[in-house]
From Swiss-Prot:
InterPro entries registered for this protein in UniProt: NRAMP_fam
Membrane topology of this protein: Multi-pass membrane protein
Family annotation (HAMAP family): NRAMP
GO cellular component, one term: plasma membrane
Name of protein: Divalent metal cation transporter MntH
Localization: Cell membrane
BP terms from Gene Ontology: iron ion transmembrane transport
Biological role: H(+)-stimulated, divalent metal cation uptake system.
GO molecular function: cadmium ion transmembrane transporter activity; manganese ion transmembrane transporter activity; metal ion binding; symporter activity
Family: Belongs to the NRAMP family.
Domain of life: Bacteria
Amino acid sequence: MKKEKTERTKQSWRKAQNAPSLSEVNNSVAIPKNAKFFRKLFAFMGPGALIAVGYVDPGNWATSIAGGSEFGYTLLSVILISNILAVLLQSLASKLGIVTGRDLAQASSDHFSKPFGFVLWILAELAIIATDIAEVIGSAIALNLLFGIPLIWGVCITALDIFLVLFLQHKGFRYIEVIVITLMVTILVCFGAEMVMSHPDMQAIAKGFIPQSEIVTNPAMLYIALGILGATVMPHNLYLHSSIVQTRQYARTKEGKREAIRFSFIDSTFSLTIALLINASILILAAAAFYTTGQHNVAGIEDAYKLLNPTLGSSIASTVFAVALLASGQNSTLTGTLAGQIVMEGFLNIRLKPVVRRLLTRVLAIVPAVIITALYGANGINELLIFSQVILSMQLSFAVIPLVMFTSDKQKMGEFVNSPWLKIVSWSVAIFIAFLNIYLLFYTLTSL
């Protein structure tokens, strides 16, 4: 009976798996056997931090700054709801990887026809390039703010981080996780310090986490709210998470998978809570520094930087802000490289050397950034940053819907299939995100 069940599960996939996801690091991080809970949890911690990076990349900063400066603390509830949706979707992605041994790209390639799989690959690559554009722009702006390096040269300098990525990959997957966690802590500490300097209204903050009807009734507020929701869940993160959870040496048995799912959920939920604190602190800082002082139209990251020192009365406020921005851009670079490799190998079964893969993605991101910077300067760069987030929003449903489909399929997931209530919630979220992105696309096109 057990053998028959295994055979049925195997038959749910059309083709045998060619190679494990990220084969060079798959099953490479040891998990101590018979260890106590917290020691095991520590061994499983790490992938969640890499995922959380996508929730605090430079692309998210613009929406949080705009929301805080224009509407005060009201949109904090939107950041909270976005985070809850993220926890749900990332838990599905990690479960898919742990149970099936396939990442989302491999599963999609097997399930769908070759032409449709190719379309999904193109869309996923566009999302990764869009993410990389946001990283390039964020790092270039930070270098400009900290050292006065012209934006166009800052964009070119970001190509050098390729060598950092390659060095860390060579050292081992745990090194990448440690660097990412260090940079995340840097960002959190920076914004913690900024918040202390800004003296926010704690009562207004508490009220901001309660959803208000005006978010829906005020068109301008609704648009920024949708922008926060649309830019929070990153499509490449779903591919990434379904792969990197497999770096752990958990037993590939039912009990081992169940334990891995539990620890992975704790890991990602903890890391996404840190991301929530960072995003909330960006909005709180913008509200305390700009909204309460009547500066309601802070157009971009550079404007926020310039206004922080005189508003907060501290000479280091802007510097700390720029350091956090640079850390955010570098963090996202590390995860973008891995996601690109996962997508190309999973959909096309093409295995490029990491240096070639990274150069290809970075060149495709740098070229538009250099052209826009040369032609339009800082204003053009901010427009490109917003455009990259629109591209990400458009692609999201093409990752979310297959993810919900696969994790709701008993033949693929066996006893780990989504429960009836989880299916209802997951499909509701998928439909909501699809509607949200259609609305955002329509609004963007009509406002051109």
